[in-house]
Amino acid sequence: TLRGPTEDGAASVRLSDAIYETFRLQAIHIPAAAPHPTKLVQSAAMASVAPPKPTYRPKLPVAVLHDGMLSDAQLETVIYAGDAHGAYLAGSWTVDETGDMVSAAPDDAADAVRFRRGFFLGDGTGAGKGRQSAGIVLDNWAQGRRKALWISKSDKLLEDAQRDWSALGQERLLVTPLSRFAQGKDIPLTEGIL
């Protein structure tokens, strides 16, 4: 459900002299969503600006919402990421055989491709970025986009990615380490999370 302005037309956000404000969903309301298990804050400047109203509705297993596998704040992230992933970047492109060279191409070129828009997740400690990332991948997965790259600082975070994916009711072994494949060789997976 989208949230609207107050009756007098003003946004329902109040300014204060605090540096941080308690985080709350501003543009949407997600009925039956669990509150985030820890207190989240945002800068007062961020809290004073209402985010855009998304038009996207995620495709997630019912249990994700009803069993509280993702909190309201984490679901908001999935919604905004889905809003971005539902559109393409401007222009058309050609990609060479190696995948190393991308060049602008006319829209009607026979071998032209388009690229989906991305989404940057910059939440701080305690927001559950791994769980949010798993939710974003799961939403794409449910729509048939079954190839994902999960990039982490080190391979030691593989178990964290597998934990977050399986916490959403998914098979943890679908998160496959890149080290399982020889460098410079094709990766034969037809679907999965690398």
What feature does the model see in each segment?
Residues 72-75:
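Carboxylate-rich, divalent-cation-coordinating active-site regions
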Residues 114-136:
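Walker A/P-loop
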Residues 20-26:
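Eukaryotic nuclear, charge-biased low-complexity tracts
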Residues 2-20, 35-69, 95-110, 116-117, ...:
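SF2 helicase/translocase NTPase motor core
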Residues 83, 126, 155-158:
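Short, solvent-exposed loop/turn segments at secondary-structure junctions
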Residues 82, 86, 130, 138:
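Residue-level marker of positions within ordered structural domains that often coincide
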Residues 83-90, 109-118:
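Phosphate-binding P-loop
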